Amino acid sequence: MRGFGKYLLWVYAGMALTFLMIPIVYTIIFSFNDSRRTNIIWRGFTFDNWTSVCDAQDVCPAFMNSLIVAGVSTVLATAMGTAIAIALVRYRFKFRQATTLLLFLPMATPEVVLGAGLAAQFLQLGVNKGLGTIIIAHTMFCISFVVVTVRARVAVLDPALEEAGRDLYGSPNQVFWRVTFPLLVPGIVAAALLSFALSFDDFIITNFNAGAAVTFPRFVYTAAARGIPAEANVIASAVFFLAIALVLATQIRGAIKRQQLAKAG
């Protein structure tokens, strides 16, 4: 009976993984399809879509807009979120719990509510919508995810390490940059990658606050009615391969570091 349950668990895990991978595999395969539009009809294998990825109108500009928005909002959200996370863990101040609750609210609020609320604010303030308003909106909701991720890292740091730095007559700045910050780097990197992914593929909040600006998700959505260009599959596949490469590089780096620590020990 126990063996049968283990078998069912593996079957369930395989089905879940297959369900998750089907859209990705479809996108990769049909990025090589000899067709100018995405469809389920295989017309032959070709590299033309990969060698002429910017030939389709508006694909590359939309992709670059997404990279700019995701990059800038990630830097802003990571910087502010890291500072907030350290303050919430290390310092006691009035309304600390209320601040924590407010920071978690964007994570629990539906994106359509956040998007509509921000759009109304920009309208009231007379702000012209564009890449700037998208960056503001993305930074706002990404900060919460950064705080949660970095806060977990700060909470497990050994205070004795910082005390040792102070005992060696290190100034507060020296202790932070030479002791605390290096220990926080894994959490900060994880938070930055999460923020970039959330910003890059966001559609709902972006659609409310983009104005005439077109990001890659907006381009795919509007192009779906007339047929998504095959070049969009190429870009999506390239982003997926890049994400896999980053994960593998992180795992390899971690394995090498563990081996070095084991040898040193």
What kind of region is each of these model predictions?
Residues M1-Y7, G71-L103, A116, A120, ...:
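Transmembrane-helix boundary motif in ABC transporter permease subunits
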Residues R2-G5, S35, W50-D58, F200-R253:
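Interhelical loop and adjacent transmembrane-helix boundary motif
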Residues R2-Y12, I22, F95, R151-E162, ...:
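C-terminal transmembrane helix and the adjacent membrane-cytosol boundary/short C-terminal tail
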Residues Y12, L17-I24, T139-M140, V147-R151, ...:
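Transmembrane alpha-helices
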Residues I22-I24, A70-I86, V112, A116, ...:
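Hydrophobic positions within alpha-helical transmembrane segments of bacterial inner-membrane proteins
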Residues I22-Q57, N207-G211, G265:
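Short membrane-interfacial helix/loop motifs at transmembrane-helix boundaries
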Residues T38, W42, F47, V112-C142, ...:
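Membrane-interfacial helix termini and adjacent extracytoplasmic/periplasmic loops
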Residues F63, L88, L105, A160-L168, ...:
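Short hydrophobic faces within alpha-helices
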